[in-house]
Amino acid sequence: MGQCVTKCKNPSSTLGSKNGDRDPSSKSHSRRGASHREEQVPPCGKPAGDILVNGTKKAEAATEACQLPTSSGDAGRESKTNAEESSLQRLEELFRRYKDEREDAILEEGMERFCNDLCVDPTEFRVLLLAWKFQAATMCKFTRKEFFDGCKAISADSIDGICARFPSLLTEAKQEDKFKDLYRFTFQFGLDSEEGQRSLHREIAIALWKLVFTQNNPPVLDQWLNFLTENPSGIKGISRDTWNMFLNFTQVIGPDLSNYSEDEAWPSLFDTFVEWEMERRKREVEGRGALSSGPEGLCPEEQT
């Protein structure tokens, strides 16, 4: 996501010789037959005439030692910073592509274009997973912070990058603890925060239950949703407690509902549901019995 070019600069000061820094006022020993004069000491070493065993001049070796390159840690940090800046720039461009003209957020129209580019339907499970990762406060809206933080959370800064994360998000949502978090998020996601709602409208709750259980449909879900659909007058809304407890209900109560007890601390709506469902099943069994016996209690073969 970006490359860093590190420039290595030599230190401005020179190092002393092997025996330490010389006093500027001191003179070197005179050579044979020559007058006293100041010795010219090459930077970072002894005079150039000194040769190491491998043929390298000591002055050259010492000078090379003085070239202090930027450490790999510094280079790595700089490269990471550059990569983050490049990623932020791409996120900014992506966000501006869908944001509303007046509000600094992606609203309904922008969300439709966003989902269209992702090749997903706005009402499908993958969009719910994306909203979960973005920690969106309400449906059909991503604020700037939600969008940027969410994309960082899934390590994506492009349409292709987001699409590439969907398989791992689907797998993650199958984990029990992750699904519980997703499930509880979904209730809050369905509320109209601007109106200060504290419970879900029945129709919204039904739609969200179908959506959140896309990958793991509990046996009792269809009966529960039928109950909610056929009893509109008696159910005004779904509270947070009822929503949260329904997940526990699907995990501990068997499909035949035989281990359900009204004495346990279940929401009262569950008592009504179990009573309604057991009565419905009873009528269903009686209806099948009447059909099998035929008119006037005769078996079909006896009627011929």
From Swiss-Prot:
Record's GO cellular component terms: cytoplasm; nucleus; perinuclear region of cytoplasm; plasma membrane; ubiquitin ligase complex
Lipidation (N-myristoyl glycine): G2
GO biological process, one term: negative regulation of protein neddylation
A Pfam family recorded for this sequence: Cullin_binding
Membrane-spanning parts: none
Sequence segments annotated as region (Disordered): 1-87, 285-304
Gene3D superfamilies in UniProt: Cullin, PONY binding domain (1.10.238.200), EF-hand (1.10.238.10)
Subcellular location(s) of the protein: Cell membrane; Cytoplasm; Nucleus; Cytoplasm, Perinuclear region
Keyword entries, A-Z: Cell membrane, Cytoplasm, Lipoprotein, Membrane, Myristate, Nucleus
GO molecular function list: cullin family protein binding; ubiquitin conjugating enzyme binding; ubiquitin-like protein binding
Chief localisation class: membrane
Subunit field text: Part of a complex containing DCUN1D3, CUL3 and RBX1. Interacts (via the DCUN1 domain) with the unneddylated cullins: interacts with CUL1, CUL2, CUL3, CUL4A, CUL4B and CUL5; these interactions promote the cullin neddylation and the identity of the cullin dictates the affinity of the interaction. Interacts preferentially with CUL3; this interaction triggers the relocalization of CUL3 to the cell membrane where CUL3 is neddylated. Interacts (via DCUN1 domain) with RBX1.
Domain remark in the UniProt entry: The DCUN1 domain, also known as PONY domain, mediates the interaction with different cullins. The DCUN1 domain mediates the interaction with the N-terminally acetylated NEDD8-conjugating E2s enzyme leading to the NEDD8 transfer from N-terminally acetylated NEDD8-conjugating E2s enzyme to different cullin C-terminal domain-RBX complexes; the neddylation efficiency correlates with the DCUN1D5-cullin and DCUN1D5-E2 interaction affinities. This domain is also involved in CAND1-, cullins- and RBX1-binding.
Function of the molecule: Contributes to the neddylation of all cullins by transferring NEDD8 from N-terminally acetylated NEDD8-conjugating E2s enzyme to different cullin C-terminal domain-RBX complexes and may play a role in the cell cycle progression by regulating the SCF ubiquitin E3 ligase complex, after UV damage. At the cell membrane, can promote and as well inhibit cullins neddylation.
Name assigned to this protein: DCN1-like protein 3
Name of the encoding gene: Dcun1d3
